[in-house]
Amino acid sequence: MQADFVIIGSGSAGSAMASRLSEDGKHTVIVLEFGGSDVGPFIQMPAALAWPMSMDRYNWGYLSEPEPQLNNRRITAPRGKVIGGSSSINGMVYVRGHAEDFNRWEELGAQGWAYADVLPYFKRMEHSHGGEEGWRGTDGPLHVRRGDARNPLFHAFIEAGKQAGFEATEDYNGGKQEGFGLMEQTTWMGRRWSAATAYLKPALKRPNVELIRCFARKVVIENGRATGVEIERGGKIEIVKANSEVIVSASSFNSPKLLMLSGIGPGQHLQEMGIEVKIDRPGVGANLQDHMEFYFQQTSLKPVSLYSWLPWYMQGIVGAQWMFFKSGLGTSNQFEACAFLRSAPGVKQPDIQYHFLPVAISYDGKAAAKSHGFQAHVGYNLSKSRGAVTLRSSDPKADPVIRFNYMSHPEDWEKFRHCVRLTREIFGQKAFDDYRGPEIQPGPDVQTDDQIDAFLREHLESAYHPCGTCKMGSKDDPMAVVDPDTRVIGVEGLRVADSSIFPSLTYGNLNGPSIMTGEKAADHILGKPRLARSNQEPWINPRWEVSDR
């Protein structure tokens, strides 16, 4: 088995690369994927988003080590174990990120990845329905749309934000991110539009693309060059040879794990694991970042929430309507309103994100109260806390050791306390007067800093946006793992391209930036000229230095 390019992982970036590397017919591509089929309602029905993440069949099911700042809780850290990777089990929320995110990447050493450089790739990948003209792509493979937003609670949330003095935005993925508006999702024709649907499945119809179901054990490195991948399938160890390059695209947990199993990583740690050190790169597995969030939940005085649809027999009606007609509530992830806000004067870009949901419910689908309600998923998205991914042993099948070190930076506590109080202010606006009942969570008795901190320690959870563990940077940065061309520093014929190479978190969900990374990396790999830099200037709040709104 051999191909010009061997891609480990069929996730957001891996699927995009498989398509772009093979589209001219000149190169052969093999995609290695351990996970199984994405066919079936649990993945394809948008409203069923809670199911695949709770199923071992689709999710690697990782847990963090006990988190000291969060009452030593082990935090769930899901990653997709299925065709399409995490794009097949995520919440389908589409956020490009803020322009300043990518400008920060370039400042951190990722030359050629500033906003002006990446915007053309976002446009190339998008098939936007109703986005801002001139800022959005309209003929790409990834369908992006807004929900119908028929529930009055969505509009109450947006109106409440305006009443509180915040901006509104018609398209947060266009020229103006800041403000309250309708949220976009990667769904189309009533179903999830994953990277597998957008990129991989069309690519697999080409004679030069092959998908191999297997477990990737390590990258084979000979004389300083990656020559293939050692895999296991059917109980046998085999080698898939790469005539040109091996591209690791296995997630922010498994990409550094694979590099370390291959002898690339912190030398002392590899020696402790009994692994021969091929390249001593201390940055492999370091720089782990993630978004955290909590649910702010309120009862509703009017029976307008989705609570009526939670009983099993009502869910059956939703499922049947989706199955036979691809219509109804099943066609949306129900995250149809949002906000991107700045936490304080002097903060230039939004750093607080809201997902609004017209029901009070946990991510696993359990109701928060036996009544109608609504909630906001609230997160401070520019945390300075950093963690690491390391090996548990030299056994390729052992789960990685994941230490996020959540809330280890004092600023995180200040920002999340502000998030609690800010949400109370928003939910307290006139737009919610007809709907607002008693507060469920955090609860009316949670008021002081100490009380809020106690709530946060017990209720903060991951937003499932890990990144940064194979950081992209300049070759003279000792903590960089890949250079701005996505090449692993010190090894020929080996690249990494997924969210693990992000130097820093983007402001928002990571599926969109991950796909963009695959799109752009493909041009680097093929040696193509980069798409022409954009000269469009995004909107920055003119009051940012003196006001938070």
Swiss-Prot record:
Pathway: Amine and polyamine biosynthesis; betaine biosynthesis via choline pathway; betaine aldehyde from choline (cytochrome c reductase route): step 1/1. One of its GO terms (biological process) is glycine betaine biosynthetic process from choline. Its EC number is 1.1.99.1, 1.2.1.8. It comes from the Bacteria. Its cofactor is FAD. Keywords: FAD, Flavoprotein, NAD, Oxidoreductase. FAD binds at residues 4-33. Signal peptide: none annotated. InterPro entries: BetA, FAD/NAD-bd_sf, GMC_OxRdtase, GMC_OxRdtase_N, GMC_OxRtase_C. It holds the Pfam family GMC_oxred_C. The keyword Flavoprotein applies. HAMAP family: Choline_dehydrogen (MF_00750). Belongs to the GMC oxidoreductase family. NCBIfam families: betA (TIGR01810), PRK02106.1 (NF002550). This is Oxygen-dependent choline dehydrogenase.
